[in-house]
């Protein structure tokens, strides 16, 4: 009912074209069965390295323990990006509300899709990495799962300039989309989802599976919660997006920052998996206590995100502080009954896990092995 009210009369001719489920979508339940999802940022030229090739994925796919035995590592991967620097026209664009640059339009959304589906990177490279690991260990019980980011349909061409145009995104079926209309924002999101589905279907992957989508904003601002609702109107498109991806048997995932606007009501808006960020890794003031975090996620039935970056490597200043905080995540998850009961996601900066896996420093090796053992022995995985 809500989606129908929001959509109104919009892009009807386009909507009528898109009710077909692909065969692999028909066979699937929308309930996501994966336990440990690692975040992979990519698509913008400022990322170093830029490409996600099979060598970069390899440590995330398989882990060799200290006895020389190989194990499957992360069972799911979130491909995401929030900004575009060095794109086709050289300008800077934002995929999420609140970031610097022009709001990304249809061309930039297409660039993001192109990046993840390019030959030798993204989906293709992950498929290769899993195939090669399968040659050594045999096929895993299930395909590795992929969740792909969804850009914000940002209201204004410059997100905080209400004098800038709302008709900047591009056309659908020959009609210019105007993001002052909720239905046009939803139509753009549906176009994006359909383009991703079409591109994935054409690839015929055997070792990976596209299972969900992820709105890039870390807060869901509504009239009664959050800042600058007049610039965001998040509630106009989240529930319709959830309804749309569910129609094709995908899950909708979200990772809000600690106590972000919308975290209490996310499940009622249609999200299937909500991993809240503790933000403890960067907490210099002590105002994001882990005890409060665990109470929050239990009360609101949320999953947990782990957080680390390259800063925990021994070569970096204050690495001991960051290592200690990361151990707090593992110890806290076990202490509070999250480990083995709730799904987990892992923020690792741009390349943190890869660099940790390649380090020869004894402290780094210990952390790497402790963390990998934590992931591969997740009791929840054994039930899937």
Label every PLM stretch briefly.
Residues 18-190:
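N-terminal catalytic cores of secreted or lumenal carbohydrate-active enzymes
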Residues 192, 216, 220-237, 242, ...:
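Extracellular glycoside hydrolase catalytic/binding regions
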Residues 142-154, 175-193, 211-215, 241-263, ...:
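Aromatic-lined carbohydrate-recognition surfaces of secreted/lumenal glycan-active proteins
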Residues 70, 74-75, 80, 257-262, ...:
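Substrate-binding cleft of secreted/luminal carbohydrate-active enzymes
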Residues 31-40, 71-79, 141-147, 208-214, ...:
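Structural preference for beta-strand elements that scaffold enzyme active sites
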Residues 50-63, 99-134, 171-200, 228-243, ...:
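Well-ordered, non-membrane alpha-helical segments in soluble/globular domains
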Residues 1-8:
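Bacterial N-terminal signal peptides
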